[in-house]
Regions:
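Catalytic cores of TIM-barrel enzymes
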Residues: 1-148
Length: 148
């Protein structure tokens, strides 16, 4: 039987004949420890409350499946989406130039050992980033009231 990587590569060929369907991300080894991800989100430890590089207070209870942003009037980074430039400060990514070779070597070895393709991972898209900066309800309201 082929590896998930081999099945995926067969699947994307124009006339490919994969031996079976793959489950969602089965063919991918997700690299979660790249320098940018570690820099932006690396301080999220189970059982703690911390601030990320965006200034969002993050709670990660022991019994929770993942970290969640904490929003109170004094902790919300972006209380008014129409004035986001005044309160949201993008982290300086130029400081993330170290550690790429080690990350690449370690991640590639893990992917090869599992017979998978190596993939980067970024779990925070535009909606999720807004949710972290201004809260879930305020994000939904802002998207409705200010679609541009």
């Amino acid at each position: 039987m082929s590896t998930p990587k081999g099945i995926f590569l067969e699947l994307i060929k124009p006339d490919g004949q994969p031996e079976r369907q793959l489950c969602q991300y089965e063919a991918l080894h997700m690299c979660l420890t790249d320098p940018i991800n570690t820099y932006l989100r690396g301080n999220r430890k189970r059982g703690s409350v911390s601030k990320d590089r965006w200034g969002t207070t993050i709670s990660f209870p022991e019994d929770a499946p993942g970290p969640i942003p904490v929003h109170t009037p004094e902790l919300t980074v972006c209380p008014d989406v129409t004035h986001w430039k005044d309160t949201v400060h993008v982290p300086d990514l130029s400081v993330c130039s170290e550690g790429w070779e080690e990350c690449r070597t370690r991640s590639r070895a893990a992917a090869d050992a599992e017979g998978k393709l190596l993939a980067g991972f970024m779990g925070t898209g535009i909606f999720e980033q807004c949710h972290f900066l201004m809260g879930f309800e305020d994000t939904l309201t802002a998207l409705y009231e200010h679609p541009d």
